[in-house]
């Protein structure tokens, strides 16, 4: 049958929603341009009537202005209708796109869960627990090695009371070192002599022993002759 009558042409896909929106917006833009031109024509007629006196000429211009105004109103209704159509189609397009995005999200989530299940099958929980136990044993052995290396030998045991007594004694020694009162006698200045060296005069209140020019006691004469 196909050979006798031939195959029908494949049906072409209809315009998409975006194409319809673009077409309606273009028609609305064209009508709005016509409205703008009619407004300019109305301003021209209004200026003419403002400069004319009442009479047949002014009435003729007025009729033209009324005709242009009717056209403007008709175009405004068409433009509003087209804008409403475009808005409704945009809302429908947004809803359709949201559904597509939702489907894509769900498909991606399903694929992710499938991959997670596949990877989870490759994991052996018992093997992981064995590894953790082995690591714990190795850390414990490492601690034992460190403790053995840091062990000391030949050190006598010291009582805590003895250590405390030695610490208290050390504090007393430090306090004694800080006491400088024993230096007072050393740094004290000597008194000035009460008389000049070699003088024989006796100062009241002082010793009566005679001294020589060096301040030393003189040897009695009787002892010299002996």
UniProtKB/Swiss-Prot annotation:
Keyword Membrane found: yes
Subcellular location(s) of the protein: Endosome membrane
General function of this protein: Probable peripherally associated component of the endosomal sorting required for transport complex III (ESCRT-III) which is involved in multivesicular bodies (MVBs) formation and sorting of endosomal cargo proteins into MVBs. MVBs contain intraluminal vesicles (ILVs) that are generated by invagination and scission from the limiting membrane of the endosome and are delivered to lysosomes enabling degradation of membrane proteins. Specifically down-regulates Notch signaling activity in the germarium, probably by facilitating Notch endocytosis.
InterPro entries, A to Z: Snf7_fam
Record-given protein name: Charged multivesicular body protein 5
Region (Disordered): 188-226
Basic and acidic residues bias spans: 188-198
UniProt record similarity statement: Belongs to the SNF7 family.
Disulfide bonds, paired cysteine numbers: none
Key words of the record: Coiled coil, Endosome, Membrane, Phosphoprotein, Protein transport, Transport
Gene: Vps60
TM region(s), chain numbering: none
Modified residues (Phosphothreonine): 226
Coiled coil: 21-93
Membrane topology according to the record: Peripheral membrane protein
GO cellular component term of the entry, any: multivesicular body
Modified residues (Phosphoserine): 201
Main localization category: membrane
Subunit annotation: Probable peripherally associated component of the endosomal sorting required for transport complex III (ESCRT-III).
Keyword Protein transport: yes
Record organism: Drosophila melanogaster (Fruit fly)
Any Gene Ontology biological process: protein transport
Annotated signal peptide: none
Reported phenotype of the disruption mutant: Homozygous lethal. RNAi-mediated knockdown in ovarian follicle epithelium results in cell proliferation in the germarium epithelium. Stalks between adjacent egg chambers/ follicles become elongated due to increased number of cells and the linear arrangement of germline cysts is also disturbed.
